[in-house]
Amino acid sequence: MEISTLRHRTGPCRFSLVPVLVAAALALAVGGLSGVALAQEDPLAYRLEIYVVSHVTREDGTREERYTETSEARPGQTVEYRIFVENVSDMTLPAGVVQIRLPVPEGTEYVPNSATPSSDRVLTEFSADRGMTFSEPPVLVGDDEQRRVAEPTAYEEIRWTFFVELEPGQEETLVYRVIVR
């Protein structure tokens, strides 16, 4: 499944984020839980919001970020994904069990240091080899003989593992940004 498209129109190319939304939702559903036997229904509900980030200079000279909800973006624009994960089951989900994986869509580059960072609540890891391996930065790629550190702009997936129990009704928010090429 292709997760991004470039649509040509009269004027500049636009990056369609709608297929990305669908693919991200699928990635969430597939990567939602690992290592736990649960009923067939997913105990997690997901909501994804997509914003174009712009910067404006206020009268006092300070810069401020503005967010515009969108389904399309143009090359050079920064897009912020906000993922809301809620435990919709009636049971507490154990710490270390809930994992969320999301792609860095084709046609975009991950913005360094933009993902919800690792903390005592969540571990944030990246992959630069199509999800084969994940690690916290620095992310290494290549064979043993040609091992090198991947630039953050080469990251292809992000994985978060929650180190806290998720109580029924509890919602957690994850964020990351990309730049449209």
Each PLM stretch: what is its role?
Residues 2-3, 37-181:
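Exported/extracytosolic protein signature
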Residues 11, 31-35:
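Residue-identity detector for glycine
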Residues 1-15:
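N-terminal secretory signal peptides that target proteins for export/translocation
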Residues 13-14, 18, 176:
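Structural motif marking the loop-to-transmembrane transition
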Residues 4, 24-28, 69:
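Exposed boundary/loop context
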Residues 7, 27-31, 57:
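Compositionally biased, low-complexity repeat tracts
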